[in-house]
Amino acid sequence: MPRGCAGARFACNACLNFLAGLGISEPISPGWAAMERLSGLDAFFLYMETPSQPLNVCCVLELDTSTMPGGYTYGRFHAALEKYVKAAPEFRMKLADTELNLDHPVWVDDDNFQIRHHLRRVAMPAPGGRRELAEICGYIAGLPLDRDRPLWEMWVIEGGARSDTVAVMLKVHHAVVDGVAGANLLSHLCSLQPDAPAPQPVRGTGGGNVLQIAASGLEGFASRPVRLATVVPATVLTLVRTLLRAREGRTMAAPFSAPPTPFNGPLGRLRNIAYTQLDMRDVKRVKDRFGVTINDVVVALCAGALRRFLLEHGVLPEAPLVATVPVSVHDKSDRPGRNQATWMFCRVPSQISDPAQRIRTIAAGNTVAKDHAAAIGPTLLHDWIQFGGSTMFGAAMRILPHISITHSPAYNLILSNVPGPQAQLYFLGCRMDSMFPLGPLLGNAGLNITVMSLNGELGVGIVSCPDLLPDLWGVADGFPEALKELLECSDDQPEGSNHQDS
């Protein structure tokens, strides 16, 4: 192993000489120093992907085409997308790897990039309502992306109930974006005016050949012992602090403490979705009424909707549900990578019958969970995953399906709240009326609920597997009911009162 490797992005002479000694010799391209390597967390979503677990981040947009300059045609839409993508290199980058690479893959420019490889067109069946749109989008969500091309697709869905509308589904691999980065990527295709000129083209970072990828990978691999020497003490300290917190009752929900539900089980290859939309003014009224945060209200809405759904099916657990919640650390982490998030576990107390007590319990629990997550730090998870590779995570994916979840799943669902723009946006010239985010399913948690705000509305996207939950509209329709309940319920219960169903 060569010595003298100090970083993970540039290849040192020792690495180049080491590889040259193996008979690997290729010219160095001028742009290879800018080659971007996936972080461990980025690559995690590649390594954990299986045919029954596609790890894509999606969003469904409802567009008013009457604002498109010149009028909407698919050809104009295609041409507009082509112009905007030229200004966003992320849309033109694909994975590159080699068997000699000891680190994670890299992003390089796709020299054969063509919009037609990524843009699809499909007609919505009659009558063109939300159920027909959801059926198409659920099918698309379950399709894998082609890893030989940039990891995204856009589907234009025409033929809705109104002639001046189309729906668009954008699907991007989780290795490319997390929730916040996905919103930023989407913004590259938006403007504040329908006739805004397309941005100027931006050059990509170039490519990388076998030697370049292997050399910089060898450098990163050689630096792992140094990084491990830092991570292990930090982990030990975190474990000690967590034990002390547990003695005082100041920890987030523990993994594998979740009750069994109908949406916890082995995942199939298919996906189904449902969605709904709420008025952000009402959400903020609930926030102000109870003196809580928007995140607390989102969890309370989820708890109320799931309570209604589980009660209707006679399977409401006596214990609180447990959600894993991604927490953005884009403004707190100095680690490289597209995905800048950690996770926390929060309780979703659907067993509490009184909505006022339910949201107060949620607010108190979330305060503890956020404090615990902050104590763990924004980079510990990222640092540990950095050491994992395809072999380790592949073995995990072979083992996990055989772990019994009859009594206590690791968690019941994934719950995410992504902040969105509070302005009227135009997507390639079309007015964006609604946006519904859709997250992936992971492990044996067959339910993902993601919300995102847009111009005074809160879009709620729900994803599951039809093998577990054949019909999600009962969950989606529970959100407006849960919001109404929080707006109208009495709040005269004494502090600490906890009404539960027996």
From Swiss-Prot:
Write the Enzyme Commission number(s) for this entry: 2.3.1.20
What does the record list as GO biological process?
Answer: biological process involved in interaction with host; glycerol metabolic process; glycerolipid biosynthetic process; response to hypoxia; response to nitric oxide; triglyceride biosynthetic process
Q: Catalytic center at which residues?
A: H174
Mention any one GO cellular component term assigned to this protein in its UniProt record: plasma membrane
> Record's Gene3D superfamilies?
Chloramphenicol acetyltransferase-like domain
Q: Which pathway is it part of?
A: Glycerolipid metabolism; triacylglycerol biosynthesis
Q: Does the keyword Flavoprotein apply?
A: no
Name the domain of life this protein comes from.
Bacteria
Listed transmembrane segments: none
- Report the family membership: Belongs to the long-chain O-acyltransferase family.
Indicate what this protein is called per its UniProt record. Answer: Putative diacyglycerol O-acyltransferase Rv1760
Organism, as annotated: Mycobacterium tuberculosis (strain ATCC 25618 / H37Rv)
